[in-house]
Amino acid sequence: MKILVINCGSSSLKYQLLDMDTQTPIAKGLVERIGLPGAVLTHRPADGEKEIITAEIPNHTIAIQLVLDALVNPEYGVVKSLEEIGSVGHRVVHGGEKFASSVLITDEVMQAIEECIELAPLHNPPNIAGIEACQKLMPGVPQVAVFDTAFHQTMPPHAYLYGLPYEFYEKYKIRKYGFHGTSHKYVSQRAAKLLNRPAEGLKLISCHLGNGSSITAIKDGKSIETSMGFTPLEGLMMGTRSGDLDPAIVSFIQQKENLSSDEVNDFLNKKCGVLGLSGVSSDFRDIEQARDQGNYRAALALDVFSHDVKKYIGSYAAVLNGADAIIFTAGLGENSAEMREAVVDGLQYLGAKLDLEKNKVRGKEADISAPEATCRVLVIPTNEELMIALDTLDIIQKG
């Protein structure tokens, strides 16, 4: 079976068409600047040259129509007809408490996703637009929703509740939801295979480190604690997000800078993190380069970030009562040997120790632990598209 995976942002759309017999992509691509001037589709067949298609793309329906046209194009397409596509898997950012797993999309499911809009006002509307476009353009093809939050629905109440009046949870559903769930789920399954152990009995700490970063404690294949919270702003300091703060700082900044609540929220999401601390960039590669050129603030930002990661690993080791493995994934986790070394240095008490030669790996699955390490350190490139496709296939096969 071939499965199309769709990930819609407000003005962008990423897609992959996967052959589930081999679990590999046949084509992938990106539509940029939806609803804006200069819209473009970059289409990459797995065994061909990339095609760049410019067009007026006023909305997600037109964007998906262009993607489908590209997939069947006689010149650079990869399937003879759309009938070869057995199902579509959609990334949906927020499923609230309603969804603890991926689901076949029905009218009731769509209504529930719409009810989660206030929890993810920037993300769920374009996710919905993508689903509606596919329903219109591919009638009769099963559509599946895969939620970023679903994997974390196994967290116990003592992990997901905040120190607020319980009525606020009942009235407004204020609680920790967690994100990057599809990524954490994928790498935890790969880790079990790499370690040649069943998920049951395994204690894993998964570090998804990139422009957005989160850490998850995984026990018996299930998430029991995670660093992102009610929104993706909580937890680690990130590319442009502040991460954990004393809540009183928010009103203090509002008063000092004369900001509205929307403005301060925008500030904490887009102008803080390593960008704010370094004054250089939100891209860790740029910051590492600036640090190497003697930039004090760049060095400071990297130190704060690695300290943050180490602190969360320590607290999750406490929650798990030890750890069998620490996983590094996503852009920074997969590619920065320096960051991995800075994080693992000082975790000897956990039994974690790097082999510095093996740690030079970039973007490939590897066990980078020293032979004597009792807590393994793994690099596992994430593959959210494959995880979405596997979940979609599972649901279609179950009928």
Swiss-Prot record:
Cofactor notes: Mg(2+). Can also accept Mn(2+).
Catalytic activity annotation: acetate + ATP = acetyl phosphate + ADP
Residues annotated for Mg(2+) binding in this entry: 7, 384
Alphabetical UniProt keywords: ATP-binding, Cytoplasm, Kinase, Magnesium, Metal-binding, Nucleotide-binding, Transferase
Pathway participation: Metabolic intermediate biosynthesis; acetyl-CoA biosynthesis; acetyl-CoA from acetate: step 1/2
Domain of life: Bacteria
Protein name: Acetate kinase
Organism of origin: Desulfitobacterium hafniense (strain Y51)
GN (gene name): ackA
